[in-house]
């Protein structure tokens, strides 16, 4: 599992899979910094009430859960 701190610090550049399951209440906008590489995004177990309208910016994303 990855941490929000790693994401915000830019330490996850180039990854293809991101696991931010559990403990989020808002969608981290920093995820868009990974748009060139991110294929799998795990947001399960979070208290997200919605996803951003511009989620389509993650053009390589194939799996979202």
Language-model regions: role of each:
Residues 1-45, 49-65:
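The feature captures the LRR N-terminal capping module
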């Amino acid at each position: 599992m990855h941490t929000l701190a790693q994401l915000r610090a830019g330490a996850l550049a180039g990854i293809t899979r991101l696991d931010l399951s559990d403990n989020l209440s808002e969608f981290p906008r920093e995820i868009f910094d990974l748009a060139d590489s991110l294929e799998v995004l795990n947001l399960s177990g979070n208290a997200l009430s919605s996803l951003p309208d511009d989620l389509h910016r993650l053009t390589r994303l194939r799996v979202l859960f």
